[in-house]
Amino acid sequence: MSKDIPNIGGDRPHGRIVITYGTFDVLHQGHINLLRRAKELGDWLIVGVTTDNFDLERGKMNTRDSVMKRVQAVKETGYVDEVIIEEYKGQKIDDIQKYNVDVFAIGSDWEGYFDYLKEYCEVVYLPRTQGISSTMLREEQISVRIGIIGTGSIAGRFVPEAKFVSGNTVSAAYNPDQEECRKFCLANGIPMAARTLDELLANCDAVYVASPHYTHYEYAKAALLAGKHVLAETPFVLHLSEAEELFSIAGAKERTLMVAHKTAYCPAFRHLVSMLKSGVIGKIVDINASVTTLTDENSSKLDHARFGGSMNENACFPLLPIIKLLGRDIRNINFYSIMKNDVDMYTKAVFRYDNATASFQVGLGAKTEGNMVISGTQGYIYVPAPWWKTDYFELRFEDQNMNRKCFYPFMGEGLRYEIREFVSQILNPEQNLYLLTKEEIIAMARVQEDYINGKNVYKLS
């Protein structure tokens, strides 16, 4: 079926309109062959290129090139008449009707998947070029070898999550307890159980510090001085001077230093911050967030000698939205802690800014609802428990007809988002680390240090 093509901007001829979609990452001959075959099906070829955020929301963690670089590469093939951006699920139906499309073309690896589009246009599955793919090309490019320090539960979750991100391999692990390290490597398919820290550092390009938090500073410093990139688990460090020193070393060595704060990198929180910064609920006047877990009294998390306690274990989570949204210029903080054996089982912190307030509750020996509420002059945002790994939040207003529910994916354990950001930053060091900045991380360390030093800490019996 042929039709007159609408003349938009005087560029379109008359004839059949063909549309195809893809990420087109690391453009290769397979992509070019598909575009050529799609062009042969009609007179005008429209190509939809996915955005970085849409890829991330679909769980596509391995995209190497930015959307603009991918768009430019598609244009330069010479087969494409028009490029559009694919931003949301279901857009294909909208585009087919909007552009009066005759033929939808896609690779044969999607055979049958897009048959539902036959209601709107002809669907053609094009033969795929064998022996080449973006994934294969990415794997042939530089791969970051990651060494893991620590073999606890979080390290065990890191290894399978890293497999969802291209451009990295877990090459080695280290634990002073050699038997534990050997078992961990055997269980997770890691080729080397390093006998010493130096041996680990000699066999990796980057280090994931997943040891007890009171050891983060020493391990991160040793790795940076050895010229390694560092991803350190939360809480990063517990003292301001340590945070400042580590970032100073990272800068001097031109190495990436990141905190493995999965909330900061997950799609829902990223969108939440962007919406709030745009003024969707007006001016923010208050934030309240809670993170509590009931912990066995014999746990190391409640060991005073190992800097255990609710603040040291959990405060990094609510500190993220408070500092991210209200800033680093905190006028005053008061801490109210219920203590047992010199460890805070539950702490409430109250923040005062010039034009806003904030508070959080953290606990290891008490339980409360783990939600977050952000109040503004025009409405508020409610994030249900567990807000720190949310895939959903609500915008609520005085006029309930304006309320909105926002859903975003949270894949697996969520660690793949921070790993993706870490690997991407190493491979593309010109990128700006804006999702969790050095200044914000240092501000969090300052709050942790204030608590450890007893500044405005009120201990309750």
Language-model-detected regions and their locations in the chain:
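C-terminal helix-rich "cap/oligomerization" subdomain common to oxidoreductases
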Residues: 199, 206-208, 406, 421-461
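N-terminal Rossmann-like dinucleotide-binding module
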Residues: 143-188, 414, 423, 460-461
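Nucleotidyltransferase catalytic core that binds NTPs
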Residues: 1-143
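Beta-loop-alpha module in the N-terminal Rossmann-like domain of NAD(P)-dependent dehydrogenases
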Residues: 179, 188-246
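Rossmann-fold dehydrogenase core element
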Residues: 244-262, 283-287
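Contiguous beta-strand/loop segments that form the cofactor/metal-binding neighborhood of enzyme cores
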Residues: 313, 319-390, 420-429
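N-terminal Rossmann-fold NAD(P) dinucleotide-binding loop
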Residues: 31, 155-158, 216
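Predominantly a Rossmann-like dinucleotide-binding segment in NAD(P)-dependent oxidoreductases
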Residues: 263-333
